[in-house]
């Protein structure tokens, strides 16, 4: 909707505010993450927690059994009972394994399922809250890219923090608590001494969590900015391509991902440092325990067995505490990610769409009154739009608001819809303040048709059904008939089920508009608000739609913002608004009586523009200003056929200016229809990506990785070495007193040394792998983005390459790939080193026993493999389903005004929840299977222990090994097993990462059919600007069944102006798309100065052309940067060039009058400027480029008479000596063209000057002009 100059500068303040809060890294208390749990979730969490406690206590219980074993072996090593005694203990191991299977299953399954369910609730609550916010919130605090980023990226962190990681955390803590309880029972004094290390551990852990949270918040903030760059670039790809802005987009994207990379390194280093300190503290405390334990044996009569039991239990308990660090990291990341989402969820909107309080009457009459209204847009509170504005519209009357662009006309509509509340004064309906009504009810009585209708990426039928809950097919059909849309819909292959594409790009402008009107008609409103509702239609459609509107307007209060003569002239009341004041009001004939009044001046303005070809009478009649339109086909200007238009991608509020153009003719079938049916066959299934391929991308970091590998290997060997030390200590404890004293001191020192090693090794390992992983992600993201930006335009017509989906791919997928390289490699090396050193130590101690255990290793291997298999989580299918769900969110947030005005919030939520059902079911299934795999793996492990000790007893019985060697083998292998089991915790990540890698490499490997990064091709020294289209035939790749051009020939001489005229959908804008090589013709050729376009360097070719579309796409940056974009970057254009271009485009004056001038930020999609203002900025952007060829696609259609005159003057100055191709409906523009070409049925039906064509009796042009004349009378 045209915001009438509202709100520049908003995003400026927003940028500052977010960056400040991010610095402080705010988080949510952990328990608050579970705020959305229902009773079933609570049940699951209780079961899961009980399972986790059971699972955790198994380890200390196992150490008790282990104490029994030491006793059994120690006391019976020389007698025949050893096998009997030991086998009894072994049986207990098997029972414990069974118990652990059940507990582990409950732990994993319950927590994974509840995590999936609650994350889904948070996502859906977040979207629900976003939809209920007042429109001002979207102007100031958020944008589509951020919402989609939070829903796809941040919820992954939140789910991570509330799913199986919680179970794991409870398990580890209960191991710790259970262990210490048993240790106190066995030997309290020694346990107390060992406990002294706990405060140090806690401090290290807390410091680490703090640092990690800080870094991760900073990283998320940088990624959110990068996501916005992706959203803006992909969403406006035609503009980016036309202005060769790819490089600029890539650079700003790289800037943000580099700052995210820096945060990730800090995060890695902090984690490593924390771990290193923890392990150092552990080892020092063991040193203390060994020295002190020796003392206890000598002085307090402890036995060696009990000392070892206490040490082992405390080791096991404390180690489990150390393993909580990934959980703590995940909690910290989840808490940081949840902060922004929960803040939003808690936010109470100023105008609440879900508020059920307020009056609900039987019906309303429809008297509308604005009483002494003071208003400024929230994004620019200092700039008053209205300062005491009043207006009364009696029920059933039609009131027309006219005035220049930016005067506040659309603001009236915004206030009546209650998108905003006035600062002072009131807006009344039937004498009751709007604030007193129930918002949903009063909005249901108001129908809105904007100048730039917003459609959702679903079918035509679903789009119309937004107008009314539970509408029947019959009602929908009647509404399409009334809106004159039934005919073109029936011509589409899928009829009402045709998909309209992202933002309706599959339809031409007029088609979109008629669907929007049908949607409003279905609502059967008492008050109808038409914001330029017919401006986008060609004469023929306009006549029929206007008749439809006339039928619909009967007995309804109607407020029209328009420039069209016919609409305004018959209005009961016309109000002329200037700079937020009503300067005149009355009927058409009353206002004309004052020959120096504002209205008469507007009309005169129009006459000059119009040329003098129309009869003065109609001129006068002229309402506001569109009468001059030869509106020949505005309807679609669009591009006829594909998604064309440049703007289209702009999407939402762009004012489109006239809305429309974006679409294409749908002459038949939505562009993507063919594919939808077949299930988008166009996309081949993703090829698997080999790990070597990803590793190759990490090549530059080989030195870092090698060093990291060495460090990780040292780190991995630490625990098995620890095993030798413990078995040596056991031995020492059974030695004579003086030897015991000496040995205990010696081994204590060795332990401290081991701790110091860990202190150096751990942070180095984390840091080195963070550098390698971070650089890899950054490289993959920039390669992928760079590749995507250079794809041919038709690639973006595919739904799977929409801006929302691409944003999710770049943020989520790239981060997952890192798990394959950095973290996973680091862990794999560490675990391999643990395993290898464990085996070596075991074999040296007792090769027979080690061999027996080794034979059983495959069992452990199989169980590890099963775990990996079971954890194949979040399969590709679920991933793309969530992508589809985020597209629903993307659409709704981008079109929040439409959603609000149709009270469609619940409908959007239903669509969103429907898209999420599948992935949630998959998550539940996956949780169930993972739980089984996880439990089973523990059972196998315990069976292996039981078998090993039984075999050991046999060997001891036969005298083949000694009791100390048995334990050395056991400790070395246990420690190795702990290493191996840790690596399986990375299983879920690697499978997700492979799917992610495939989706990213699918983009990197694709060859662009029209590659703007390709530097080859001819560059002409001197461009004259002769263009020739020879025998073109063309269909849009996404709709191969619809022929746009059959055999089109057209010659455009250098320096001349050619106007293309024709009905909506005839292919006029397609000519412009082909000239810029957004698409290539199927046959025939286009030449520039005799050279075929395909032979010219693409980037150079696009630099020779300046495009001004009817729906200009501006970026969320300053006005200066938007104009300089024409040169390719802000640095390339000097201040004087920018100002000169703005003056030429008649934009300098309005820019200078805004507080921040050229530094004003235009807002997402330029929403802070009115239509006419945006258009002038776009013209300045094209002028700065100094193009040889100018392409004007309805460039002035969105302007009021005054701006149009000025812009038209500017364009007249600019087109001198330039080859110009104009798609237009204004008689004046077309009439003065050197050649007018009529496009019809895929060929040029007539061409010549206005004078020659008008004389052809029964000619297409002559009849169009005739139709126009009668329409204006």
UniProtKB/Swiss-Prot annotation:
Keywords attached to this entry: ATP-binding, Glycoprotein, Membrane, Nucleotide-binding, Repeat, Transmembrane, Transmembrane helix, Transport
Sample GO molecular function, one term = ABC-type transporter activity
Residues holding ATP 1: 403-410
Q: Where are the transmembrane segments?
A: 42-62, 93-113, 169-189, 192-212, 272-292, 301-321, 706-726, 746-766, 840-860, 927-947, 961-981
User: What SMART domains does the database record attribute to this sequence?
Assistant: AAA
Q: How does it sit in the membrane?
A: Multi-pass membrane protein
Q: Where is this region: Disordered?
A: 1-20
Q: Which residues are glycosylated?
A: 470, 555, 631, 648, 801, 1116, 1217, 1247
Q: Where does ATP 2 bind?
A: 1062-1069
Highest taxon above the source species: Eukaryota
Give the main location.
membrane
Can the keyword ATP-binding be found in this entry's annotation?
yes
**Does the record carry Acyltransferase as a key word?**
no
Q: Please give the family membership noted in the entry.
A: Belongs to the ABC transporter superfamily. ABCB family. Multidrug resistance exporter (TC 3.A.1.201) subfamily.
Enumerate the PANTHER family for this protein. Answer: ABC TRANSPORTER B FAMILY MEMBER 4-LIKE ISOFORM X1, ATP-DEPENDENT PERMEASE MDL1, MITOCHONDRIAL
Q: What is this protein called?
A: ABC transporter B family member 12
Species this protein is from: Arabidopsis thaliana (Mouse-ear cress)
């Amino acid at each position: 909707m045209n915001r009438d100059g509202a709100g520049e500068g908003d995003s400026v303040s927003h940028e500052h505010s977010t960056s400040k809060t991010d610095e402080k890294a705010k988080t949510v208390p952990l328990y608050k993450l579970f705020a959305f749990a229902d009773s079933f979730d609570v049940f699951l969490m209780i079961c899961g927690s009980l399972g986790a406690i059971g699972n955790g206590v198994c380890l200390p219980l196992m150490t008790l059994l282990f104490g029994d074993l030491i006793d059994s072996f120690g006391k019976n090593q020389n007698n025949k009972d050893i096998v009997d005694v030991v086998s009894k203990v072994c049986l207990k191991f098997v029972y414990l394994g069974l118990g652990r299977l059940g507990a582990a299953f409950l732990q994993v399954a319950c927590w994974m399922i509840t995590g999936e369910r609650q994350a889904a609730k948070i996502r859906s609550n977040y979207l629900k809250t976003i939809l209920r916010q007042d429109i001002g919130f979207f102007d100031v605090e958020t944008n589509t890219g951020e919402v989609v980023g939070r829903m796809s990226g941040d919820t992954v962190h939140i789910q991570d923090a509330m799913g199986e990681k919680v179970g794991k955390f409870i398990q580890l803590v209960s191991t710790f608590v259970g262990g210490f309880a048993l240790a106190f029972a066995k030997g309290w004094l020694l346990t107390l001494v060992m406990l002294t290390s706990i405060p140090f551990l806690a401090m290290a852990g807390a410091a680490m969590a703090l640092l990690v949270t800080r870094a991760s918040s900073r990283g998320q903030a940088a990624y959110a900015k990068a996501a916005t760059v992706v959203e803006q670039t992909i969403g406006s790809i035609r503009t980016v391509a036309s202005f060769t802005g790819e490089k600029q987009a890539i650079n700003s994207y790289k800037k943000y991902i580099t700052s995210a990379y820096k945060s990730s390194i800090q995060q890695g280093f902090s984690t490593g440092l924390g771990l290193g300190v923890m392990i150092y503290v552990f080892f020092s405390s063991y040193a203390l325990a060994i020295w002190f334990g020796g003392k206890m044996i000598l002085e307090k009569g402890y036995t060696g067995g009990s000392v070892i039991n206490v040490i082992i239990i405390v080791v096991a308990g404390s180690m489990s505490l150390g393993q909580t660090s990934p959980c703590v990291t995940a909690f910290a990341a989840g808490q940081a990610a949840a902060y922004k989402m929960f803040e939003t969820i808690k936010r109470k909107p100023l105008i609440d769409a879900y508020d059920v309080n307020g009056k609900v009457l039987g019906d309303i009459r429809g008297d509308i009154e604005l009483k002494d209204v003071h208003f400024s847009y929230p994004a620019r509170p200092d700039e008053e739009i209205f300062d005491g504005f009043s207006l009364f519209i009696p029920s059933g009357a039609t009131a027309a608001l006219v005035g220049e662009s930016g005067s506040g006309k659309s603001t009236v509509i915004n206030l009546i819809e209650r998108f905003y509340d006035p600062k002072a004064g009131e807006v009344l309906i039937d004498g009751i303040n709007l604030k007193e009504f129930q918002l949903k009810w009063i909005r249901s009585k108001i129908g809105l048709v904007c100048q730039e209708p917003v459609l959702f990426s679903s079918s035509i039928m679903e789009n119309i059904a937004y107008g009314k809950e539970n509408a029947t097919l019959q009602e929908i059909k009647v509404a399409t008939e009334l809106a004159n849309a039934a005919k073109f819909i029936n011509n589409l292959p899928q009829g009402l089920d045709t998909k309209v594409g992202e933002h309706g790009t599959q339809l031409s402008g007029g088609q979109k508009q008629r669907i929007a009107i049908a949607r409003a008609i279905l609502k059967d409103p008492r008050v109808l608000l038409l914001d330029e509702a017919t401006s986008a239609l060609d004469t023929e459609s306009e006549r029929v739609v206007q008749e439809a509107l006339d039928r619909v307007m009967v007995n309804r209060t109607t407020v029209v913002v328009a420039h069209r003569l016919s609409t305004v002239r018959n209005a009961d009341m016309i109000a002329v608004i200037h700079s937020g004041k009503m300067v005149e009001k009355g009927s058409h004939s009353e206002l004309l009586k004052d020959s120096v009044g504002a209205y008469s001046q507007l009309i005169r303005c129009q006459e000059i523009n119009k040329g003098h070809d129309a009869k003065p009478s109609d001129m006068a009649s002229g309402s506001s200003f569109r009468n001059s339109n030869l509106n020949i086909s505005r309807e679609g200007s669009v591009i006829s056929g594909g998604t064309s238009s440049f703007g289209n991608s702009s999407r939402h509020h762009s004012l489109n200016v006239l809305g429309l153009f974006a679409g294409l003719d749908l002459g038949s079938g939505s562009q993507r229809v063919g594919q939808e049916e077949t299930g988008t066959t166009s996309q081949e299934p993703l090829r698997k990506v080999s790990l070597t391929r990803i590793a190759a991308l990490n090549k530059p970091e080989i030195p870092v990785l090698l060093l990291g590998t060495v460090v990780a290997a040292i780190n991995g060997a630490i625990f098995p070495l620890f095993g030798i030390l413990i078995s040596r200590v056991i031995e020492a404890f059974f030695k004579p007193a003086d030897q015991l004293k000496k040995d205990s001191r010696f081994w204590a020192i060795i332990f401290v040394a081991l701790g110091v090693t860990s202190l150096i090794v751990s942070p180095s390992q984390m840091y080195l792998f963070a550098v390698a992983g971070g650089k890899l992600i950054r490289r993959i993201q920039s390669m992928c983005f760079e590749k995507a930006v250079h794809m041919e335009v038709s690639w973006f017509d595919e739904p799977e390459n929409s801006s929302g989906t691409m944003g999710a791919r770049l943020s989520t997928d790239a981060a997952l790939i890192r798990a394959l390289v950095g973290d996973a490699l680091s862990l794999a090396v560490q675990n391999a080193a643990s395993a290898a050193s464990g085996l070596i130590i075991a074999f040296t101690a007792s090769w027979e026993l080690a061999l027996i255990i080794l034979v059983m290793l495959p069992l452990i291997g199989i169980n590890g493999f099963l775990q990996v298999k079971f954890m194949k989580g979040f399969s590709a299918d679920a991933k793309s389903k969530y992508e589809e769900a985020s597209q629903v969110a993307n659409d709704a947030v981008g079109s929040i005004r439409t959603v609000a005005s149709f009270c469609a919030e619940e409908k959007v939520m239903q669509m969103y929840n429907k898209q999420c059902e599948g992935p949630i079911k998959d998550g539940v299934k996956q949780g169930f299977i993972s739980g089984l795999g996880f439990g089973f793996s523990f059972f196998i492990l315990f069976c292996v222990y039981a078998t090993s000790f039984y075999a050991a007893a046999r060997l001891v019985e036969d005298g083949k090994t000694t009791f100390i060697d048995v334990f050395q083998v056991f400790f070395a292998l246990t420690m190795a097993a702990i290493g191996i089991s840790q690596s399986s915790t990375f299983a879920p990540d690697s499978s997700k990462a492979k799917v992610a890698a495939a989706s990213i490499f699918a983009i990197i490997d694709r060859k662009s059919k029209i590659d703007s990064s390709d530097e080859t091709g001819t560059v002409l020294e001197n461009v004259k600007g002769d263009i020739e289209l020879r025998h073109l035939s063309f269909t849009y790749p996404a709709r191969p069944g619809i022929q746009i051009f059959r055999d089109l020939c057209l010659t455009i001489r250098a320096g001349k102006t050619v106007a293309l005229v024709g009905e909506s959908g005839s292919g006029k804008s397609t000519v412009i798309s082909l000239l810029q090589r957004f698409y290539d013709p199927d046959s025939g050729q286009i030449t520039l100065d005799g050279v075929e376009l395909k032979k010219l360097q693409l980037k150079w070719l696009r630099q020779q052309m300046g495009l001004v579309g009817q729906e200009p796409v501006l970026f969320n940056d300053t006005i200066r940067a938007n104009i300089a974009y024409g040169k390719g970057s802000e640095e390339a254009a000097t201040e004087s060039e920018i100002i000169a271009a703005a003056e030429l485009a008649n934009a300098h004056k309005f820019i200078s009058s805004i507080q921040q001038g050229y530094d004003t930020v235009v807002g997402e999609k330029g929403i802070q400027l009115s239509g006419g203002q945006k258009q002038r900025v776009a013209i300045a952007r094209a002028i700065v480029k100094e193009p040889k060829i100018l392409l004007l696609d309805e460039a002035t259609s969105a302007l009021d008479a005054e701006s149009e005159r000025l812009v038209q003057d500017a364009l007249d100055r600019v087109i001198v000596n330039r080859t110009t191709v104009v798609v237009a409906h204004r008689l004046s523009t077309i009439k003065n063209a050197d050649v007018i070409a009529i496009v019809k049925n895929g060929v040029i039906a007539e061409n010549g000057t206005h004078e020659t064509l008008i004389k052809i009796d029964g000619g297409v042009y002559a009849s169009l002009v005739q139709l126009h004349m009668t329409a204006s009378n």
